[in-house]
């Protein structure tokens, strides 16, 4: 729950001076991105902005305290303030903030600005006491906020110091409205108005001016002088002389003498006790001070001018002026040290009664009451965990003695889940092992089963499927039906283990069961995870259309539950990119991969490895080797600076080896082959992928025999495990092996098998990536006119894609190539004596690439009759009579120049 007072603009009090000159300056605030009000404590920053905000509707107010350095808490309150200003316009952001379903503050703000794009009225967001923020992540996020906020939004920041918000840049660009302490200082006229409304006996204008000069227009000093004069302890001028030249850091002695020592003991204790509350209402005051009629007492304190502020229009919530509140808290520690723990306990109990466990924890920690802290955690810790209050929980658990954790194993489990969420896998097992060693009878029953479910999740995350399977099975055997969260975890882990083992049918059933349980109990991140796993399994089985439909369900879940910022969203868009790539929808595949990188923009660059590999695949499928090389440089740098799952390494190696194949880089392939991992098995898609990488490198190096052994074994495993997509890929690579080894009939046989299987998988780009060798074979099959209709159609589609993206031979017949060809000692004499024109060389290249006359005309943007003339001329010069002879002649020329065709 959010504390309402933190989102309430302070009420404009009676007897305050209206700062007309400053309000006039603020009237143009909507013309600036940032309005910055800075001064030391007590200069009237909050009072000024509350005057300016009076009557404005499209304004949100966020009052900070020290606890707002937690990113999640900061995000929740800031979005709530925007919702307040827009009357609930940004519903998606609100849900994301409440459920902590965002990757970072910047990504949450990016979503906020998308929603605010439809809000066209002027909008204001006030953040008070920004000097309390010390978290550099929040500073950086707010700099992002200011850079990208909509033009109709003005951010108003109140701070005691200059905040780290890129102020200089805003100032240069005239996007900053500044009001500092010199402007906030009271003028002679304002000081006179102030005393006139505060004192029963007016003072002369000259006296008022001297007092104002003595304290340099400091509003707090003027307030103290008025308070002192009302209490008749000193004359106003005498108080002013005493305050002259001091500042907020030297006020303590003055406040003791002039405030605390001039109230009765009951009021003094009321002030000291109530000051431990960052915000207060009637119920909190009653419990903390022991006085009834807390609301009346607060209103009385307010009337006495003792630096108390109303925080909302209803008058329910109050707080002390920060300067006075800090002073009172310090005095409370000195004067009521013995009572202080009990006061904090009372505050914690009252906050709990009002449904604010995080505030209660703050006071339980301050009281040093481990028993109270334990009880709060036992009742509310999992709710706080699910709302990502991780820093607060970690601090709380550290404050509990180990014996208290042992007496309450649920708290040990919570601490272990905290470690797991931070990827501290080794510490999880150490903690649980220690607990099991010291807790009697823990090795049996429900708690042990919950430990095992968590251990299973850690084991699968850490790449240990056998141990994960053992632990997940134990957990499911021991967990009661009602322990749904741990049952979801264990079922998901078991499904993932079976996926790794290639038992796809059983794995799919368990992941469907996980989805059903997770949806039933609103455990949305596991529901999303199970859908992603289902899609991967269906892809591996060759059911790409069903995989697509499962992905659609996952995207719908993300939209409904606002899970866009979860890292798992990247996993989903990445496997969507893989599917689109397989179907040769390259532009969409690239866009999907780039959106995955955007999801991970606030994470370590190493997390982007998979999406980067997907972008390289798109470049390779287009034949764009320059772009692929540029991206590969970055990929190889990431590989050298991180630890990755074998699936990630396999995908990264795949694009590297394909690139070496396309560029003929045998040295790189040989070096990689010497050092790369040789998996013991090949019973899942990523192990199959790594062995396929090895076979491709062996083929490039001419090591046909070992490559054939690898591929035949892969095919045997793929058939037995029904890894149909892997079988399709393996057949294509085996085709390349046979083609290059001169075993043309074997090459044709496996190519026909691959085309037939592609009717199920829908593969296109996997054929295209093999380039001209594949194009030649497909041209021959099409010319034979013996393919079934579906295979014939697919072969024509693949050939069109190769012709579009892999015009290697057309590229070879450029001016530089022709010049080198004509100077080659073995060039046919006929070409030397009767050379082709540059246009005729281009036409020959397109004929060789499989283009029809109409396609050549379209490519070169000339009439079809012109192309016929060019063809007739080049046939005559080459001494050939038909198209196939021209193709064979071009092939001989390319071989002569050293191109493997």
From Swiss-Prot:
<dbReference type="GO" id="GO:0005524">
    <property type="term" value="F:ATP binding"/>
</dbReference>
<feature type="binding site">
    <location>
        <begin position="39"/>
        <end position="46"/>
    </location>
    <ligand>
        <name>ATP</name>
    </ligand>
</feature>
<dbReference type="InterPro" id="IPR011990">
    <property type="entry name" value="TPR-like_helical_dom_sf"/>
</dbReference>
<keyword id="KW-0547">Nucleotide-binding</keyword>
<dbReference type="InterPro" id="IPR027417">
    <property type="entry name" value="P-loop_NTPase"/>
</dbReference>
<keyword id="KW-0119">Carbohydrate metabolism</keyword>
<feature type="DNA-binding region" description="H-T-H motif">
    <location>
        <begin position="853"/>
        <end position="872"/>
    </location>
</feature>
<feature type="domain" description="HTH luxR-type">
    <location>
        <begin position="829"/>
        <end position="894"/>
    </location>
</feature>
<comment type="similarity">
    <text>Belongs to the MalT family.</text>
</comment>
<comment type="subunit">
    <text>Monomer in solution. Oligomerizes to an active state in the presence of the positive effectors ATP and maltotriose.</text>
</comment>
<dbReference type="GO" id="GO:0003677">
    <property type="term" value="F:DNA binding"/>
</dbReference>
<dbReference type="InterPro" id="IPR000792">
    <property type="entry name" value="Tscrpt_reg_LuxR_C"/>
</dbReference>
<keyword id="KW-0067">ATP-binding</keyword>
<keyword id="KW-0804">Transcription</keyword>
<keyword id="KW-0010">Activator</keyword>
<dbReference type="InterPro" id="IPR016032">
    <property type="entry name" value="Sig_transdc_resp-reg_C-effctor"/>
</dbReference>
<keyword id="KW-0238">DNA-binding</keyword>
<dbReference type="InterPro" id="IPR041617">
    <property type="entry name" value="TPR_MalT"/>
</dbReference>
<dbReference type="InterPro" id="IPR036388">
    <property type="entry name" value="WH-like_DNA-bd_sf"/>
</dbReference>
<dbReference type="GO" id="GO:0045913">
    <property type="term" value="P:positive regulation of carbohydrate metabolic process"/>
</dbReference>
<keyword id="KW-0805">Transcription regulation</keyword>
<protein>
    <recommendedName>
        <fullName>HTH-type transcriptional regulator MalT</fullName>
    </recommendedName>
</protein>
<dbReference type="GO" id="GO:0045893">
    <property type="term" value="P:positive regulation of DNA-templated transcription"/>
</dbReference>
<dbReference type="Pfam" id="PF00196">
    <property type="entry name" value="GerE"/>
</dbReference>
<dbReference type="InterPro" id="IPR023768">
    <property type="entry name" value="Tscrpt_reg_HTH_MalT"/>
</dbReference>
<dbReference type="Pfam" id="PF17874">
    <property type="entry name" value="TPR_MalT"/>
</dbReference>
<dbReference type="GO" id="GO:0003700">
    <property type="term" value="F:DNA-binding transcription factor activity"/>
</dbReference>
<comment type="function">
    <text>Positively regulates the transcription of the maltose regulon whose gene products are responsible for uptake and catabolism of malto-oligosaccharides. Specifically binds to the promoter region of its target genes, recognizing a short DNA motif called the MalT box.</text>
</comment>
């Amino acid at each position: 729950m959010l504390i309402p007072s933190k989102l309430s603009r302070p009420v404009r009090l009676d007897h305050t001076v209206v700062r007309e000159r400053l309000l006039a300056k603020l009237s143009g605030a909507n013309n600036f991105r940032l309005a910055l009000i800075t001064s030391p404590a007590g200069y009237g920053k909050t009072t000024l902005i509350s005057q300016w905000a009076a009557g404005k509707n499209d304004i949100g107010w966020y009052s900070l305290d020290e606890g707002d350095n937690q990113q999640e808490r900061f995000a929740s309150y800031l979005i709530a303030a925007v919702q307040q200003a827009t009357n609930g316009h940004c519903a998606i952001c609100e849900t994301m903030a409440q459920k902590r379903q965002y990757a970072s503050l910047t990504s949450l703000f990016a979503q906020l600005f998308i929603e605010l794009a439809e809000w066209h009225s002027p909008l204001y967001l006030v953040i008070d006491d920004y000097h309390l923020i010390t978290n550099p992540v929040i500073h950086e996020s707010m700099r992002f906020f200011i850079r990208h906020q909509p033009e109709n939004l003005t951010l108003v920041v109140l701070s005691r110091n200059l905040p780290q918000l890129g102020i200089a840049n805003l100032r240069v660009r005239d996007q900053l409205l500044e009001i500092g302490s010199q402007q906030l200082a009271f003028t002679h006229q304002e000081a006179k108005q102030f005393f006139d409304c505060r004192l029963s006996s007016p003072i002369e204008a000259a006296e008022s001016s001297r007092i104002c000069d003595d304290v340099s227009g400091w509003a707090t000093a003027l307030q103290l002088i008025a308070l002192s004069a009302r209490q008749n302890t000193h004359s106003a001028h005498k108080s002013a002389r005493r305050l002259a030249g001091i500042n907020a850091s030297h006020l303590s002695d003055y406040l003791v003498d002039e405030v605390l020592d001039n109230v009765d003991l009951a009021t003094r204790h009321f002030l000291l006790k109530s000051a431990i509350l960052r915000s207060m209402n009637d119920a909190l005051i009653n419990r903390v001070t022991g006085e009834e009629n807390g609301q009346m007492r607060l209103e009385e304190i307010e009337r006495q001018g003792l630096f108390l502020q109303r925080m909302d229009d209803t008058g329910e919530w109050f707080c002390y002026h920060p300067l006075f509140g800090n002073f009172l808290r310090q005095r409370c520690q000195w004067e009521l040290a013995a009572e202080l723990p009990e006061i904090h306990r009372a505050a914690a109990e009252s906050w709990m009664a009002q449904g604010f466990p995080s505030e209660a924890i703050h006071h339980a920690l301050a009281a040093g009451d481990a028993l109270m802290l334990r009880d709060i955690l036992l009742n509310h810790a999992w709710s706080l965990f699910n709302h990502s209050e991780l820093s607060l929980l970690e601090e709380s658990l550290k404050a509990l003695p180990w014996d208290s954790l042992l007496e309450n194993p649920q708290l040990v489990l919570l601490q272990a889940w905290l470690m797991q969420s931070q990827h501290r896998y080794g510490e999880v097992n150490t903690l649980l092992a220690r607990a099991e060693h010291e807790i009697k009878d823990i090795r049996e029953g429900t708690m042990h089963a919950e430990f095992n479910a968590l251990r299973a999740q850690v084991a699968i995350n850490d790449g240990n499927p056998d141990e994960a399977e053992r632990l997940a099975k134990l957990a499911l055997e021991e967990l009661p039906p009602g322990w749904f969260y741990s049952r979801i975890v264990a079922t998901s882990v078991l499904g993932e283990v079976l996926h790794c083992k290639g038992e796809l049918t059983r794995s799919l059933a368990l992941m469907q069961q996980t989805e059903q349980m997770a949806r039933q109990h609103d455990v949305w991140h596991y529901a999303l995870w199970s859908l992603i796993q289902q899609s991967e399994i269906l892809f591996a089985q060759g059911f790409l259309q069903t995989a697509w439909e499962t992905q659609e369900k996952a995207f719908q879940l993300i939209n409904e539950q606002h899970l866009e910022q979860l890292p798992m969203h990247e996993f989903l868009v990445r496997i969507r990119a893989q599917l689109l790539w397989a179907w040769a929808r390259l532009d969409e595949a690239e866009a999907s991969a780039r959106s995955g990188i955007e999801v991970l923009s606030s994470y370590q660059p190493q997390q982007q490895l998979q999406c980067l590999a997907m972008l390289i695949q798109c470049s390779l499928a287009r034949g764009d080797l320059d772009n692929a090389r540029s991206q590969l440089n970055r990929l190889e740098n990431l590989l050298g600076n991180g630890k990755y799952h074998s699936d990630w390494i396999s995908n990264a190696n795949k694009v590297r080896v394909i690139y070496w194949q396309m560029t003929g880089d045998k040295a790189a392939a040989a070096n990689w082959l010497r050092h790369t991992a040789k998996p013991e098995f090949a019973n899942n898609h990523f192990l199959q992928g790594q062995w396929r990488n090895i076979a491709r490198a062996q083929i490039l190096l001419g090591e046909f025999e070992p490559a054939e052994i690898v591929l035949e074994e892969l095919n045997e495993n793929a058939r037995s495990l029904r890894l149909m997509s892997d079988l399709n890929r393996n057949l294509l690579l085996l085709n390349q092996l046979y083609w290059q080894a001169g075993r043309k009939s074997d090459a044709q046989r496996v190519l026909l098998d691959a085309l037939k299987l592609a009717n199920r998988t829908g593969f296109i780009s996997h054929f295209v990536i093999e380039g001209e060798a594949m194009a030649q074979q497909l041209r021959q099959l099409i010319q034979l006119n013996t393919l079934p209709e579906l295979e014939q159609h697919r072969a024509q589609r693949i050939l069109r894609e190769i012709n579009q993206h892999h015009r290697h031979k057309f590229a070879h017949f450029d001016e530089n190539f022709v010049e080198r060809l004509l100077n080659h000692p073995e060039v046919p004499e006929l070409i030397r004596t009767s050379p082709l024109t540059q246009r005729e060389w281009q036409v020959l290249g397109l004929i060789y690439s499989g283009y029809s006359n109409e396609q050549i005309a379209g490519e070169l943007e000339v009439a079809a009759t012109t192309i016929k003339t060019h063809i007739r001329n080049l046939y005559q010069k080459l001494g050939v009579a038909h198209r196939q002879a021209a193709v064979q002649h071009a092939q001989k020329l390319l071989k002569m120049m050293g191109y493997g065709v």
